[in-house]
Amino acid sequence: MPKLKTKSGAKKRFVPKKSGKVKFRRAGVRHLATFGKTKKQKRHLRGTDHLAPMDEKKIKECFPYAR
């Protein structure tokens, strides 16, 4: 039986962790951030976050070998 493939779009955007949570980086900080957003908006977009439990289930299906 062939190996199952990971969804390429998911592996570029999400990182499944050993704890079972899925880490991601927030959208909206690539460009056009100098004049379109306030300092508060940019501050909240910084860093990474974990997915909500309902979204987590859908994304975990894209990673067949994640624990």
Swiss-Prot record:
NCBIfam families: rpmI_bact. HAMAP family: Ribosomal_bL35. Residues 1-20 are annotated as: Disordered. It comes from the Bacteria. GO terms for biological process: translation. Belongs to the bacterial ribosomal protein bL35 family. This is Large ribosomal subunit protein bL35. Pfam families: Ribosomal_L35p. InterPro entries: Ribosomal_bL35, Ribosomal_bL35-like, Ribosomal_bL35_CS, Ribosomal_bL35_sf. SUPFAM superfamilies: L35p-like. Signal peptide: none annotated. GO terms for cellular component: cytosolic large ribosomal subunit. Keywords: Ribonucleoprotein, Ribosomal protein. Gene3D superfamilies: 4.10.410.60. GO terms for molecular function: structural constituent of ribosome.
